[in-house]
């Protein structure tokens, strides 16, 4: 699942990072669970959470789920602390409630992130691969839309 971006450059002093990555690749961080969403029309990435520990690149897809907010199978998983990336590229999310395999989860600050154009809100969504109880790590597949 993991894909490597072309380069990573740390901007000293302000703890920000700039990365040249493919459009369908995001860099996820752990510690305070930082994620970066690649822009669609440019090779730069934009933050949707805060933190500083790099965990690796993973494939992702955008999905705007604002219209799905009231559906019971859409779960907003808050960060920090929700994103866990294993070295082999597997992704785990911390379940805030009991989950059933196939339920949808979202990654972002309060479940939300600024989109690529700076307008509106987007999520990176994932599908739970297994049943899980609240407080446990759930292996997920990033949703293809």
Segments from the language model and where they lie:
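Surface-exposed, low-hydrophobicity beta-strand/loop segments enriched in small/polar/acidic residues
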Residues: 1-145
């Amino acid at each position: 699942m993991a894909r490597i971006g072309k380069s990573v450059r740390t901007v000293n002093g302000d703890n920000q990072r700039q990365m040249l990555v493919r459009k369908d690749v995001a860099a996820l961080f752990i510690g305070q669970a930082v994620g970066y969403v690649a822009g669609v029309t440019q090779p730069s990435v934009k933050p949707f959470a805060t933190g500083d520990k790099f965990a690796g690149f993973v494939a992702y897809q955008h999905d705007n789920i604002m219209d799905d907010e009231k559906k019971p199978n859409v779960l907003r998983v808050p960060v920090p602390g929700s994103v866990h990336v294993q070295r082999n590229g597997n992704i785990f999310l911390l379940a805030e409630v009991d989950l059933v395999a196939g339920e949808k989860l979202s990654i972002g600050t309060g479940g939300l992130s600024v989109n690529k154009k700076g307008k509106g809100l987007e999520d990176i969504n994932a599908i739970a691969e297994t049943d899980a109880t609240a407080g446990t790590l759930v292996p997920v597949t990033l949703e293809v839309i």
